[in-house]
């Protein structure tokens, strides 16, 4: 693999790191101020809402909207006004001085006068034996991605907040039963969400218990529970477990550059979005330890863009000096949205579509290694990884074939290879599965994972 850094000479006015409501709103407002923001969405673009089933409390959507749909709309709106979006992950930053720089996982360096941090949060796991070992084999943090694999089965949800209730309610569409395990007697969830869960006959409750281990060898067979009052341990027999115990701020990228609190949240000055580093602003759940709502994240993204615009006008002599008025509609040369990502990849003709019927000929009998992407049209993270796989398929076509299998229309092979989480990518060599990768990853990370099996990837 070629990891030599490459610098781009253009100095941008604003770079936004992260997406979700905060990142996309910051991009929208910066674009309307004619700052032409460069946005690094990352491979988890769309943020936590990409795994949310239903958003009922975002103003303007009286009938609700799914998380991926809301993010799709926000992303397209930012594009429409001229934001430049890239799905690369940022690996390191240099934020001191008048010109800031970011380095992507692919070794590319980009520069800007101001930076907006909107990396959001990541899923908090239990950190117990068996959890990471069985991730993607019955352990999940995304009900919308993986719930359909547990039709007619007994599963568990761990947590006590709104997210746990939402996951449990969604999973009742597929599971025979859902047991909600919480370490306390009282729940943090809102009354309306808790009431819905209690009124669902498929949902059972176990309170005052912690999960001490996930049982299973190749797949989940149960949970080891400990009573927080008596200390007694029991086994709950389930085939799947969904973790919904909250999130942690993704601040490790800047933890040695800007001030953060003991829990990792980026600190801002007063009622602004300014961080301890001049010209660096922060927004969304990366900052907010109290409200953590889509609407508050969007609001702080707006504030960050306005703060950055004013700072540039005062300090950098940028385009922000030329206009602070809202602009009218503009044409964007890039209007791609997530709903077309899978179609675009397919039409490019580099990846191949395989089915249960063609699996033997296309995959198991291939002379070349074949990376099979198990995906579905409704899977948000699958849309994230689709263009990355298309790019790898094009660049590595001499060493590797990339194939896609829709688990909805071709469930047999998914069952055969115990795929219970998507996206799951399995590398086949000589007709045998030799590598399994669960979850959306960036190009550089995927190539690193594959290079120990397939040589000469670059």
Curated annotation (Swiss-Prot):
GO CC list: cytoplasm
Residues that hold FAD according to the record: 19-22, 41-48, 57, 90, 285, 292-295
PANTHER family linked to this entry: THIOREDOXIN REDUCTASE 1-RELATED-RELATED
GO terms of biological process kind: removal of superoxide radicals
Entry EC no(s): 1.8.1.9
Broad class of where this protein is predominantly found: cytoplasm
One matching Pfam family: Pyr_redox_2
Binding site for NADP(+): 163, 182, 188, 245, 265, 292
Cofactor mode of binding and number, as noted: Binds 1 FAD per subunit.
SUPFAM superfamilies documented for this protein: FAD/NAD(P)-binding domain, Thioredoxin-like
Complexes and interactors: Homodimer.
Cofactor requirements of the protein: FAD
Keyword annotations of the record: Cytoplasm, Disulfide bond, Electron transport, FAD, Flavoprotein, NADP, Oxidoreductase, Redox-active center, Transport
Region named Thioredoxin reductase: 1-321
Family: In the N-terminal section; belongs to the class-II pyridine nucleotide-disulfide oxidoreductase family.
Protein name: Bifunctional thioredoxin reductase/thioredoxin
Gene label: trxB/A
Record's signal peptide: none
Cell compartments where the protein resides: Cytoplasm
Domain Thioredoxin: 341-455
Additional free-text comment from the UniProt record: In the pathogen M.leprae, thioredoxin reductase (TR) and thioredoxin (Trx) are encoded by a single gene. N-terminal part of the protein corresponds to TR and the C-terminal part to Trx.
Broadest EC class assigned to this enzyme: oxidoreductase
Reactions mediated catalytically: [thioredoxin]-dithiol + NADP(+) = [thioredoxin]-disulfide + NADPH + H(+)
Stored PROSITE patterns: PYRIDINE_REDOX_2, THIOREDOXIN_1, THIOREDOXIN_2
């Amino acid at each position: 693999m070629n990891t030599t850094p490459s610098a781009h000479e253009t100095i941008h006015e604003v770079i936004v790191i992260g997406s979700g409501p905060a990142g996309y709103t910051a991009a929208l407002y910066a674009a309307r101020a004619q700052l032409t923001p460069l946005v690094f969405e990352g491979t988890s673009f769309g943020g936590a809402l990409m795994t949310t089933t239903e958003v009922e409390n975002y103003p303007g959507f009286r009938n609700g909207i799914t998380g991926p749909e809301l993010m799709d709309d926000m992303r397209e709106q930012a594009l429409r006004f001229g934001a430049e979006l890239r799905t690369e992950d940022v690996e390191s930053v240099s934020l001191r001085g008048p010109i800031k720089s970011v380095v992507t996982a692919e070794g590319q360096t980009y520069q800007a006068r101001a930076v907006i941090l909107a990396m959001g949060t990541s899923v908090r796991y239990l950190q117990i034996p068996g959890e990471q070992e069985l991730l993607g084999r019955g352990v999940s943090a995304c009900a919308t991605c993986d719930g359909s694999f547990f039709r007619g089965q007994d599963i568990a949800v761990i947590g006590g907040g709104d997210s746990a209730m939402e996951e449990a309610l969604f999973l009742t569409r597929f599971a025979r039963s859902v047991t909600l395990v919480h370490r306390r007697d009282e729940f943090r969830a809102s009354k309306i969400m808790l009431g819905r869960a209690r009124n669902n006959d498929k949902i059972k409750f176990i309170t005052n218990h912690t999960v001490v281990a996930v049982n299973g060898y190749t797949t989940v067979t149960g949970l080891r529970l400990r009573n927080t009052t008596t200390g007694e341990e029991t086994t709950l027999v389930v085939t799947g477990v969904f973790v919904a115990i909250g999130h942690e701020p993704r601040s490790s990228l800047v933890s040695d550059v800007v001030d953060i609190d003991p829990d990792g949240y980026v600190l801002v000055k007063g009622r602004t979005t300014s961080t301890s580093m001049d010209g660096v602003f922060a927004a969304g759940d990366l900052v907010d330890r109290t409200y953590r709502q889509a609407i508050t994240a969007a609001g702080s993204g707006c504030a960050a863009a306005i703060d950055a615009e004013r700072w540039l006008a005062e300090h950098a002599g940028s385009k922000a000096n030329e206009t602070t008025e809202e602009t009218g509609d503009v044409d964007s040369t890039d209007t791609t949205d997530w709903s077309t990502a899978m179609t675009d990849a397919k039409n490019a003709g580099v990846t191949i579509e395989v089915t249960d019927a063609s699996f033997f000929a296309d995959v198991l009998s291939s002379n070349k290694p074949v990376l099979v992407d198990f995906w579905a049209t409704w899977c948000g993270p699958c849309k994230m990884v689709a263009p990355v796989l298309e790019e790898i398929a094009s660049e590595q076509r001499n060493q590797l074939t990339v194939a896609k299998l829709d688990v909805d229309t071709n469930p047999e092979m998914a069952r055969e290879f115990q795929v219970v989480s998507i996206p799951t990518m399995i590398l086949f060599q000589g007709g045998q599965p030799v590598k399994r990768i669960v979850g959306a990853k960036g190009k550089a990370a995927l190539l690193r994972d594959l290079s120990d099996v397939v040589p000469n990837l670059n």
